[in-house]
Amino acid sequence: MNHEHPDIESQQSAADAAAAAGVNDEVERLRAELDQVKADVLRERADLENQRKRVARDIEQARKFANEKLLGELLPVFDSLDAGLKAAGDDAHPLREGLELTYRQLLKVAGDNGLVLLDPTGQPFNPEHHQAISQVPTPGAAPGSVVTVFQKGYLLNERLLRPALVVVAAD
């Protein structure tokens, strides 16, 4: 140290202190910036994970309902086969047996693809699955129960594809 020039020493100490304070300020600024970058990285990771989950959910929904249009277009075929079987009565005619077999096979294939038949005769009316077309007084039937089904309804993977058209017992 230079004892002969105390002013120079104090100036040098002041300069060192100022430099140290500047370095400390820079370190604090860099730490704050690092904390911000870490927070940004965590947020981006969370966003990426959420996006991945959303895409997986969308793909699952697309796969689950990919055959909705085809099965929806088959509903009139089911209706025609069902009506033909009802019109044929209980005769054990080979044509009737063939129609029954075809109908059961079609229902099985559709069922294997998520289609569920709604035939609510005798069940309580459910506005989420049934469409009431009329109410009739029906002795012996519980009020609000389905007494006649004009057109069966269908669910596709637990989602309503077509409501059942029904007549409900009046109160």
From Swiss-Prot:
Major localization listed first in the record, in broad terms: cytoplasm
Domain of life of the organism encoding this protein: Bacteria
GO MF annotation list: adenyl-nucleotide exchange factor activity; protein homodimerization activity; protein-folding chaperone binding; unfolded protein binding
Any one annotated GO CC term: cytosol
UniProt-listed GO biological process terms: protein folding
Region (Disordered): 1-22
Compartments reported by the entry: Cytoplasm
Entry keyword annotation includes Cytoplasm: yes
The family this protein is said to belong to: Belongs to the GrpE family.
Assembly, per entry: Homodimer.
Protein name: Protein GrpE
Lineage: Bacteria, Pseudomonadati, Pseudomonadota, Gammaproteobacteria, Lysobacterales
